[in-house]
Amino acid sequence: MKDIKQVIIAPDSFKGTMEAAQVCRIIQASVRNYFPAAAVRCIPMADGGEGMVDAYLELLGGRKVFLTVQGLQGRPVACHYGILPDGTAVMEMAACAGLPLLDGALDPMHTTTYGVGEMLLHAERNGIRRVLLGIGGSATVDCGLGMAAALGYRFLDKNGAQVEAVTCHMADIASIIVPDRKPKLDIIAACDVDTPLCGETGAIYTFGKQKGISEEMMPQMDAQMKRFARIIAKQTGVNVLDVPGAGAAGGMGAALLAFLNAKLKPGVELLLDAVGFDGLLKETDIVFTGEGRIDWQSIRGKVPVGVARRAQAAGVPCIALCGSVGEGAEQVFQKGVTAIFSAIGEACDFSQVKKNCIRDLKLLSDSVMRLLAAGSVQTLQAGVPLVLDKKYANGDFRGRWTKQTGLEHAQTAGISALDREITTERKEAR
């Protein structure tokens, strides 16, 4: 077995339970317990959602600026953004328009992104000229109406009367009044997904449910968003309908493109480039990444796949540790993930998940290191994907190996280095 001498740990936060830096520390402790001679580099990641400001400040240095802006429901909310040593401001849309701020009281028709515009204006007034704005983790589907209103844009109905800049009035908009002066900011939007604005893979159908939109409402809302996009194109000359990332944050990507001439880029790629990740991989033996849930959405711009692609290109195995796995998780194997290990093995509500998250990740991380110490790193280096689901209810682990040519389960075997028995079933590839 090749010794593990150089390790990179680069996870995203586990949404609602652990920040990325905490995840790093837990995995790092396990690595040090089982591979004490290994050099470990921790890179807390973010893809444009919660934790992005902290990730950049921890990795690159800088300071925080605190302010109060209008929140999702019109009430003041305290938030902050970061300023890097080169003067770039790093912001999170989620700081003033994120899902956690609603505490479960979803209201997609009336929530606003006005506070995002106020943050941008605050930065400009304080001499900032370059902004990196993360637009993940939002609670809104207003296509950036609120943000635009804060910047001086006005929206009129067919009679020329001003329309309130909230989602429930989007269908009434007939024209847009562009302000005489726009903020003089060079904005890069860090997107956590590459979702287009409309259609079956667009903002409403993909993320509407988690923001409180019923399936019955989706066709109507998708249609009104498409109609608004045509108005944008007519009055600004910017066609946002087919741009990857335009549907991020309920259409905020489209608004940033059209109203502020922003550039849309994958958030994970921006951070990996900022820390020189490709160079760090040259002497690395294995990479650990992860996020709260790995499923079909993970291939659309999330941290584990972004990290895994780079690792695969460098010939380095990449293991993903997550809270849970969902439908389509196997798709990440085609993007460079070598193995997935899931911490949640029994049905429970989120309060229990939150209560036990540190314990569960510690146990999972220790088990992964024991597996590697037992010799399985050779298999991982060979590029054979593995899914390992932890089942606390019955105390065993069930792993399955998958190949592009079919499904082949590993032979049943006991590995003495594990606290629990690892059982696998063999099935000939079809």
Each predicted region: which residue ranges?
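Short, Lys/Arg-enriched N-terminal segments with co-localized hydrophobic residues
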Residues: 426-428
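N-terminal loops that bind phosphate or other acidic moieties
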Residues: 2-135, 139-392, 399-401
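Short hydrophobic alpha-helical segments enriched in small aliphatic residues
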Residues: 393-395, 410
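Short linear motifs in low-complexity or flexible loops
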Residues: 412-417, 423-424
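Cationic, low-complexity basic patches in intrinsically disordered or flexible, solvent-exposed regions
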Residues: 404, 409
